[in-house]
């Protein structure tokens, strides 16, 4: 039988080149995600196993589905065995459904982590996450079985053998609801609930959260190291008021700033075991420990080990850049015109737990935001296809979209498999650092 190809030679070459790049990029990007989660110390959380499974599903789409879809698109007919057509259709539904059910499970995980933080985080073990992932794949497998069991009547085609999923209206609507619309509704409702919880928590403000460093100053007790157990942080002021040398006139000796008493009641008390560190210079206040090193995960520090240079901060005393006051590893410096406020690693067990908990909550918020972006992009990519697919089943005579537009929506859905690594790179600094470390290591090994 003479088959007429649907595209010209130039269009066929262009489409083949673009889709081949899509396949390679999808495999490379998602393999990088899996490698980053399994090898990086900054991505050890059990919930990241969801991302490993999701990346595996995207790799399977790129290797087992997209190449055959490309051949079917360019040839205009199904070139391969009939049995493989049935397996191909079932796998297509399986991987697409597993992706969205993964996102649905991730949404529920986010909700439980936000609404029942202490209770759920104690139960969120790798074993529990793996059981949830297995359940996700079983649900997707159940939804993908009908193409193997009931093939429907596809009828002859003038363009040769075709490989299409069941075209009956009941199956189209049932599969669209089960594979896309129902999970989407669950995700939207869950994330709406997460947003309301976060908004209510934000309204409460820091007073309701409590923790070290809040409340009135308590009597200092000596710590095991001999330093006072609590220290006061001087309130930050404007450059003019803080130096007492506005307009070039020094403040008279013994004159206090407005609102400042000898006991400095406005100063915040630091948690126990945070010792004060002296700075050089007569008139400078003591530098005090401000925050533990665990919080450095909240800041994006692209370069490490930078040394303090006097030229970089004109107007500051040179003593503040002396070797004795350089920032220790794992600490940060807040430099003001009053002096230098330096933090260190020495925190007590209770305070360390509080700060670790705060850092964990910050990462949870960032992770929730990144996954909201992932879900939003997934819905944007697949909604046009499922909407037009269902619309054709509801009113096939008057609502059917042109074939070219439908195929465009079909391929936009496949493109989603390559986007998650890009989203992680843009919105998550932990993944960004892990990707850079892996790629730089491979580049170094290749160079040598």
Swiss-Prot record:
List the ranges whose topology is Cytoplasmic. Answer: 39-49, 109-130, 193-370, 428-448
Lipid-anchored residues (S-palmitoyl cysteine): 440
Q: Where are the transmembrane segments?
A: 13-38, 50-75, 86-108, 131-153, 169-192, 371-394, 404-427
Q: List the disulfide bonds.
A: 85-163
| Skewed-composition ranges (Acidic residues) | 293-309
A Pfam family matched in the record: 7tm_1
Keyword Transmembrane in the entry? The reply is yes
Report the locations given in the UniProt record.
Cell membrane
The family annotation for this protein states: Belongs to the G-protein coupled receptor 1 family. Adrenergic receptor subfamily. ADRA2B sub-subfamily.
Its recorded name reads Alpha-2B adrenergic receptor
Its source organism is: Cavia porcellus
Which lineage ranks, top first, belong to the organism behind this chain? Eukaryota, Metazoa, Chordata, Craniata, Vertebrata
Q: Gene behind this chain?
A: ADRA2B
